[in-house]
């Protein structure tokens, strides 16, 4: 791997850990601070959208890191 690819990989890994933290914070917010069932309908939709986006982004970053490492 070139130095540019290594730098890109380290940046992606750093971003991945940040996304992991945000996702787990969101999940813990839902489960610990507010019960999901107690939320109004609009807030439930918003929480679900945020969770889906965070998970998709996390999965995409993992795939990109795996692809770069396999080169």
Model-derived features with residue positions:
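Extended, charge-rich alpha-helical interface modules
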Residues: 2-71
């Amino acid at each position: 791997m070139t130095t540019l690819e290594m730098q890109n990989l380290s940046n992606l890994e750093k971003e991945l850990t940040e996304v992991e933290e945000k996702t787990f914070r969101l999940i813990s917010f839902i489960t610990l601070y507010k019960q999901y069932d107690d939320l109004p309908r609009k807030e439930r939709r918003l929480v679900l959208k945020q969770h889906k986006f965070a998970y998709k982004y996390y999965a995409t970053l993992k795939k990109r890191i795996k692809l770069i490492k396999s080169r």
